């Protein structure tokens, strides 16, 4: 039994869910998202509730049941509220700047690292040590935030690098002298 797959999704005001074949489309105040779902999973919309059922009880279908429900729930949340990931730059001389459609990171390399804006995401730099990535697709927001973090991920000795807000970096002790 998939406990997550059996939960119904309650639609907020202004959000519509429709299905054509295996493609689910979610429309809301912030935009529209579409995703293909597995053919073994069927979706039913009744009023403001969306429910998912599976055609068999084999392990792969059970896994797809919960995953499909979670993906559609994230789409509903994205088109109604949106998603935001905040990154913090920790280190002497580390800074971020936004000029036009380009994010520039100075994080200790001999050259600045540039990121072009993605069409469906917004990147803000409220101050030189903070970068906010926001959009309607949880996956796309997380992917871009992970790409930015991978430029200089936090190191365990001094904790310098780019980290998610609230991320705890496990620190190590340095070598002890003779």
Swiss-Prot record:
UniProt keyword terms in alphabetical order: Ribonucleoprotein, Ribosomal protein, RNA-binding, rRNA-binding
SUPFAM superfamilies according to UniProt: Ribosomal protein L6 (SSF56053)
GO biological process: cytoplasmic translation
One GO CC annotation: cytosolic large ribosomal subunit
Record-linked InterPro entries: Ribosomal_uL6-like, Ribosomal_uL6-like_a/b-dom_sf, Ribosomal_uL6_a/b-dom, Ribosomal_uL6_bac-type, Ribosomal_uL6_CS
Alphabetical list of Pfam families matching this protein: Ribosomal_L6
One GO MF term attached to the UniProt entry: rRNA binding
PANTHER family: 60S/50S RIBOSOMAL PROTEIN L6/L9, LARGE RIBOSOMAL SUBUNIT PROTEIN UL6M
Assembly notes: Part of the 50S ribosomal subunit.
Known role: This protein binds to the 23S rRNA, and is important in its secondary structure. It is located near the subunit interface in the base of the L7/L12 stalk, and near the tRNA binding site of the peptidyltransferase center.
Family membership: Belongs to the universal ribosomal protein uL6 family.
The protein, known as: Large ribosomal subunit protein uL6
Lineage: Bacteria, Bacillati, Bacillota, Bacilli, Lactobacillales
Designated gene of the protein: rplF
